[in-house]
Structure formats: structure tokens, C-alpha cells
Amino acid sequence: MTPSKSTKFIREWLRVTAEVPARAVPGMREQDTGPMDSGRKRDGSRSSLVWDVLADVMAARVAESGRTALDVVDVGAGTGGLAVSIASRGHRVTVVGPSPDALAAARWRAAETGVTLTEVQGEASDLPALVGEPATGAAGAEGNGADLVICHNVLEYVDSPEAALAAIARVLRPGGTVSVLAANPIAAVLQRALAGKYAEALAMLPGGVTESTGASATGQATRGQASSRQAPSVTRRFTLPELTALIEGAGLRVGDAHGIRIFSGLLPGAGADLATVEALRELEDAAATCPPLRDIATRLHVLAHRA
């Protein structure tokens, strides 16, 4: 592909993906629909609560370390929407992913925004080799390792969630944070049942097997399951106890947990007018940390920290 054709392809891809709901695009994340700004009004169906949480995490790390520029690694960064937003705040961001096309799109998005990303092709389980491990006691030092690792909509697709989280733990600096966002099987059951798709809902129950992927509804993909580059369907989903167990198994301390898209995931088409959007946003934000509502959200967001 010539440079001019490649440029046109990436521009068109970014235009199309910006117009399609994130869940309709294989491997694409909610944040890839565009840069997020914690100061703008949020669409209740695409809450930027995650961004607000991350902004607080970064601000606390800056204050703690005394460094204005943090080192951030975004695993499975998609087309770079979140990575660019973080880089726009002056932080050094490395995006890691298996797809050269997605990395090229992230590079293009960064150039259009006037920021710089470091793109590295590879898998989450290879992070220590790709970005390096921090030296012992390097909590505030620049160099290898990361202050923050973004792991959003990744664990559903990797061959081994355990290996991915173990690798992430190894690249975190002491006191560093990982932000995990993953699909929730409970929400999948509710959404299908409310849509009248009872057989699909039954298959999505814990211990059931989804028809579209042949994967266990919670935690594990079946033998021979294709990776996210081969199939658009979510291969795994995690309840909050499963997600926290995975994180703790990697030697990390579990922090705050939020439910993302609790009600909007059950109300397709909600938010037709601004008043409804704002009311839904306020409800989503208030319920995000309130169990059991938090625990039925479309996606679960968990922060974890390295000691």
C-alpha cells in the first residue's frame, strides 16, 4: 500500500469507527470513539466515569512522585483514543497491541492531535520484554516500568488472563496502578433476557456456553477458541469476584471498583434529549459504586495497585 493510500485508509477507518458503537467493532474499546474530556458533559450511554477515575489516579501519582510526566502503558490500546487523551496531558504513553493496523491508526490519531505515542507490537503477556521492568525501589524514577497500566477490554480475549495480569504486575513500579475494564456476564444475561432472547440468556449463565463463541460464560474460553483478532465475539466475561481473584492472584492489591453502563446497557436508545442524557449520567455515576447495582453493569472497572 502506498503512503497516500495508507493515509486515506487510516483516515477512513478512524472516521468509520468513530461512528459505530464500540461494542460493534472487534477489539475496539469505548474510549476509542473519541478523546475524553472530564470537563465536558458526558453521554449517559458512554460514561467517561472511567476517565474521571484515571485523571484522579494520575494526579495522585504526580503529587506522590514529584514528576509532572508519568510513564503510562496502554495494553490493547485499539486506535488510541484513551492513549491520546492521556498523552495530551503531558504524560509519556506507550501503546502495546498485536495489530499493526490498530497501531498505525493510533499513530495517525496522535499525529492529528499533536502528541507523541510510542507504539510497540506484541501481546500483554510479553510486557516485561517489551517495555522493561522497573529497578527495585524505583517508585519515583524514570526509566523502565510504568506508573499506570491501562488494561481495558483485554482480558476477555487473551490466551491467558492470568499470564497477562502477571506480566502487568511485573512492569508496574512500586505504588503503580493498573486499570482493568472487563465485560460482565451478569449484564449479558440481563440484556439478552430483556430482549426476549431467553435461550441466549440461559447459555450465558455461569457455567453455560455461549453459542456465538463456544466459550464459557465466565472466565475461561473453550479449547481451540479463536483469539480476538479472529472472531469479533467476546470470548470471556468476568464477575466482580472472578476479576478481583485474578488481580489478587497476580500479587496486586485490589482498590476501587466501579460499574460502567448499569442502566444504559439495559435501555437501548435511552438519552434522546439532553435532559434525559444528564439524568441518566447522574444516575449511572451515583450507582457505579453501589452494590448490587454496580455488580450488574455491562462492564466492571477495577483499580489495582502494586505495593
PLM features per residue range, with description:
Residues 81-127:
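Class I SAM-dependent methyltransferase SAM/SAH-binding core
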Residues 150:
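A conserved beta-strand element that flanks and buttresses the S-adenosyl-L-methionine
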Residues 162-177:
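A short glycine-rich, Lys/Arg-flanked "PGG" loop and its adjoining helix->strand segment in the class I
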Residues 234-251, 257:
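Short alpha-helix
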Residues 68-76, 177-208:
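Conserved class I S-adenosyl-L-methionine
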Residues 44-68:
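Conserved alpha-helix/loop element of class I SAM-dependent methyltransferases that forms part
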